Amino acid sequence: MLDSRPHVGVLDTSVVIDITRIQRDLLPNELAVSAITMAELAAGPHATLDFEERARRQDLLQRIEASLDPLPFDTEAARAFGRLYASEFQQEKKARGARALDLMIAATALSHRLPLYTRNPQDFVAISEIVEIIAV
């Protein structure tokens, strides 16, 4: 049987957090993450007071750091971010805070011409004609 999955895809932070709960055949053959996702994961252990949750988040961060080299948020990604921001602005949406981070991750995928895998496809409806969004 032919494998129809994209060869490479960028995982949104929501997918990385839930990676052990997602069927492997729903994901691309080769996993990629943005440096922005790595930043969100690095912040995660500091965003909880629960010791066990902090340890779980730190473990996830270390496993991802050991297994994936993040795609940089470089000049091409910055240009792509501008394009995505403009699209949202035209639809009267504001890309600030966590929303801006989502757009930066999507911009990284766009700049590398890769699909973006997410658990939150509704967050990307406004840009789904620009970036290929795959819900998992």
List the model feature ranges, each with a label.
Residues 3, 69-115:
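Active-site neighborhoods of divalent-metal-dependent phosphate/nucleic-acid chemistry enzymes
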Residues 1-4, 106, 110-136:
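Acidic, PIN/NYN-like endoribonuclease modules and their adjacent C-terminal/linker elements
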Residues 1-62:
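Short, well-structured N-terminal submotif of metal-dependent ribonuclease cores
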Residues 49-52, 89, 134-136:
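Short, hinge-like loop/turn segments at secondary-structure boundaries
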Residues 15-16, 77, 122-123:
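Alpha-helix capping/helix-boundary segments
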